[in-house]
Amino acid sequence: MAFEDIPFLQYLGNAVDILLVWYVIYKLIMVIRGTKAVQLLKGIVVIVLVRMASQYLGLSTLQWLMDQAITWGFLAIIIIFQPELRRALEQLGRGRFFSRSGTPVEEAQQKTIEAITKAINYMAKRRIGALLTIERDTGMGDYIETGIPLNAKVSSELLINIFIPNTPLHDGAVIMKNNEIAAAACYLPLSESPFISKELGTRHRAAVGISEVTDSLTIIVSEETGGVSVAKNGDLHRELTEEALKEMLEAEFKKNTRDTSSNRWYWRGKKNG
């Protein structure tokens, strides 16, 4: 008995066929999402719709033009979409095309985390003082206005260059907002807490101070010791390792997508205050 002679198996095969096609289309969309290919894809959809409308309305000349555009369009797609097609083929070769991939937001967050971690580690080894504040739910517009607006994409190179001693922007804090560097050389309020160790300087007091009035997270690199600290909710956590900092940033950036029961803070260091 042939496969086609069994109605249930035929329907099941059709369903699997449709699901596979839709899955491949979905993965292709995820590959080109956020690139210029999206706009070109919209143009192709418009051409196809015009072609269908011209056929329905009997507009033979317009239909012929659309047929030519579609015919030559396939060659144009290969040329124009070359970077996206190459990336898709590379992912297919590495076996990642059919694996679960993060959303564009998650991918942007991961790149930001890696850039911050790399920059902080570089500056800590060389004892380059740094003060980096990440905005969360509480707006920090008033503090951003005290600095120099950048609205720049986050990169480890840019962060390092900002905090290089004797450069125009090194004095003050960098404030990040929505995975971007909103401003540099910003002024933060100093904490008056008596529980902060007297051995700590202005950067640490500013970090604790901003964490007392907002829900932001602030990373500090000491220029005296190269130690890395984080201030949050009025508490200062010191002597964080590179791994601990990265884990903490991942927990913070992904808190909205994680279960409440697993959304806790893990620290590898000693708490001051």
Swiss-Prot record:
The keyword Transmembrane helix applies. SUPFAM superfamilies: YojJ-like. It is a multi-pass membrane protein. One of its GO terms (biological process) is cAMP biosynthetic process. Residues 82-242 form the DAC domain. Probably a homodimer. Interacts with CdaR. May interact with GlmM. This is Cyclic di-AMP synthase CdaA. The lineage of its organism: Bacteria, Bacillati, Bacillota, Bacilli, Bacillales. The gene is cdaA.
